[in-house]
Amino acid sequence: MCLLRQEGKEDGILGKSILRMIIDLPKNVENIIERLKEHGFEGFAVGGCVRDSLLKKTPKDWDITTDALPVDMKKIFKKTFDTGIAHGTVTVLMDGVGYELTTYRIDGNYSDGRHPDSVSFSKSLSEDLCRRDFTINAMAYSNKKGIVDLFDGRKDLQNGIIRAVGDAKKRFD
């Protein structure tokens, strides 16, 4: 189970967890998030691209997390290919660049240490962020909402700390 550092808020997406800050999203990432929104879904840049942007580094790639299911993503975007449908991942091609879109999910056990044995799709960004490995990779961003940082990843980044989301022993055992 993932415990959020938010007193009295199980969802944790309100209050201090959202930091108003601007990350310069590539135009295609903005377009993907906007198209998701136009179709009634959320979309956030997530993980290493948010971390790298906060470090003033150019991200190697941009991952997007959403409450849209793969079937929805394939209807919304013209050029897609299945990257990991069982894990909720579809790659959207724009201007020759691939952007991985993954449905919010809750992961089961990891018998190979890398890929979950099972996944359950979710409608909750906070549940999706709970499955991430480290606090510095468990941050999400959209121009509208700002940075969603439920586990103090930004603080850990500033202090040079690598900390697991949840119980490190259980996560990496």
Cite the ranges covered by each PLM segment.
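Catalytic cores of the polymerase beta-like nucleotidyltransferase superfamily
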Residues: 2-4, 10-173
